[in-house]
C-alpha cells in the first residue's frame, strides 16, 4: 500500500509540474501573440506613413513637372495661334477633295489656275 501511496504522490507531483509547465507555455504563447499584434500594428503604421509620404512626394513631383512645363513651353503668341487656327481650317476645307482623290474617285484636287491663285495669295500675305 505504501508503494501505491508513494506512486500516487509521485504522479501528483508530476501532474503539478506538467500543469505548471502548461501554464508557463500558455503565458509565453500569449506574450508572443501580443508581440506579434504589436509588431503588425507597427508595420501597418509604417506602411500608412510611407504611403502618405509617397503620395505627398508624387503630388510635389507633379506640381514641379507642371511648373517646368509652363516654363519650357509657354503659351504660344497670338499670331501663332491665329496661324494654326487658319491652317487647320484650311486642312478641314480641303479634306473632302483630297479624300476623293486618294480614293481614286476624283482628279487631282488642284488645277494649274488654282496654283497661280495660291501663289498670289501667298505673295499678298507676305506683303502685309
From Swiss-Prot:
Keywords, alphabetical: Cell projection
InterPro entries: CEP15-like
Species of provenance: Homo sapiens (Human)
GO CC terms of this entry: cilium
Protein name: Centrosomal protein 15
Keyword Glycoprotein: no
Annotated localization: Cell projection, Cilium
Pfam families registered for this protein in UniProt: CEP15-like
Keyword Membrane: no
Chief subcellular location: other
Function: May play a role in ciliary assembly.
Amino acid at each position: 500500500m505504501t508503494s501505491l501511496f508513494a506512486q500516487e504522490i509521485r504522479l501528483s507531483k508530476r501532474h503539478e509540474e506538467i500543469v505548471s509547465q502548461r501554464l508557463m507555455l500558455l503565458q509565453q504563447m500569449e506574450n508572443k501573440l501580443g508581440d506579434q499584434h504589436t509588431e503588425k500594428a507597427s508595420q501597418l503604421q509604417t506602411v500608412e506613413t510611407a504611403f502618405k509620404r509617397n503620395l505627398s512626394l508624387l503630388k510635389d513631383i507633379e506640381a514641379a513637372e507642371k511648373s517646368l512645363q509652363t516654363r519650357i513651353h509657354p503659351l504660344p503668341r497670338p499670331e501663332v495661334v491665329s496661324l494654326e487656327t487658319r491652317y487647320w481650317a484650311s486642312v478641314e476645307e480641303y479634306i473632302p477633295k483630297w479624300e476623293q482623290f486618294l480614293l481614286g474617285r476624283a482628279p487631282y484636287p488642284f488645277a494649274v489656275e488654282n496654283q497661280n491663285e495660291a501663289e498670289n495669295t501667298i505673295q499678298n500675305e507676305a506683303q502685309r
